[in-house]
Structures are given as C-alpha cells and as structure tokens.
C-alpha cells in the first residue's frame, strides 16, 4: 500500500463565503488559515496547495478583545533613516480594515512560494458586496 499524495492538477478547490461580522479577529484568522492550507480536507499534503478559495465580507465589523485597539501596533519601515511608521490596531481598522485581517492570516501561512500561492486565494472586502458571485461561493459558518 502506498501513501496518497495530492497532485496540484487534481485538487478540487471550492469557493466559500465567510461573514466576519461579530467574529473575533484571531479566531477567525486561524480558521481561515487552516482552510487556506487545506488541513480540513482528507487529501491534505503539506507540500501541495490543497486549500480552498475564501471570500470574507464585512471585514470592518471584526471584533478584538481586551485593549488591543489601543495597545497593539503595526510597524512598517520605508528603508529611510527615521521612517519607522507605526499605527495602532484601532487606527488601522479605520483606515483599511481588510488589511488587518489579511495581515493576521498571512502571518499564519508558510513563508515562501507555497504560502504566497495560498495567500492569493484569500479575498477580503469591507461591506457585504463582493465581485465573486459568478463563482457561486458556499456560505461557511465559522
């Protein structure tokens, strides 16, 4: 008996719609990362992209616990001296709420070409409208 290994051409990837309204940021991000990795499928293979496509709506209505809105900071460096930019989670949620969820999920995926391919299957939108109705995503309750 041989071990089953999924092939990239034969993996069936489904589209799922996730509503982030009222969901905790970290708990939602871990479940999204698991589905992007393909760990919920019986054909999971670590070195093959077996995950599904995920469309997340209402990203601005995600919830965080504790004092993270004021105490958690996102830093980015432009490469120039003295240009370390910082903003709190609360400020980031006001400016670009979809990016907060994207950063949380991206940190839970592998670093490398396979992780980048998995990350490209995540589509996050503010509001309840999205341009993926042609794919007929199934509603996923997390």
From Swiss-Prot:
Record-level GO cellular component terms: cytosolic large ribosomal subunit
GO biological process, one term: negative regulation of translation
PROSITE patterns: RIBOSOMAL_L13
Keyword tRNA-binding in annotation: no
MF GO annotations: mRNA binding; structural constituent of ribosome
Assigned protein family: Belongs to the universal ribosomal protein uL13 family.
Keywords: Ribonucleoprotein, Ribosomal protein
PANTHER family according to UniProt: LARGE RIBOSOMAL SUBUNIT PROTEIN UL13M, RIBOSOMAL PROTEIN L13
InterPro entries: Ribosomal_uL13, Ribosomal_uL13_bac-type, Ribosomal_uL13_CS, Ribosomal_uL13_sf
Quaternary organization: Part of the 50S ribosomal subunit.
Protein name, as recorded: Large ribosomal subunit protein uL13
Lineage: Bacteria, Pseudomonadati, Pseudomonadota, Gammaproteobacteria, Lysobacterales
Record bears the keyword Transcription regulation: no
General function of this protein: This protein is one of the early assembly proteins of the 50S ribosomal subunit, although it is not seen to bind rRNA by itself. It is important during the early stages of 50S assembly.
């Amino acid at each position: 008996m041989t071990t089953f290994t999924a092939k990239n051409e034969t993996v069936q990837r489904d589209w799922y719609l996730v509503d982030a309204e009222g969901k905790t940021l970290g708990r939602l991000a871990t479940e999204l990362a698991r589905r992007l990795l393909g760990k919920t499928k019986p054909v999971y293979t670590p070195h093959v992209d077996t995950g599904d496509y995920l469309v997340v709506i209402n990203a601005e209505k995600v919830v965080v616990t504790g004092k993270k809105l004021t105490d958690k900071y996102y830093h980015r460096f432009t490469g120039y001296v003295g240009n370390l930019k910082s903003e709190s989670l609360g400020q980031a949620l006001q400016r670009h709420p979809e990016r907060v969820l994207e950063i949380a999920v991206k940190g839970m995926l592998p670093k490398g070409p396979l992780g980048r391919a998995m990350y490209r299957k995540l589509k996050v939108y503010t509001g309840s409208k999205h341009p993926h109705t042609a794919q007929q995503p199934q509603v996923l309750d997390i």
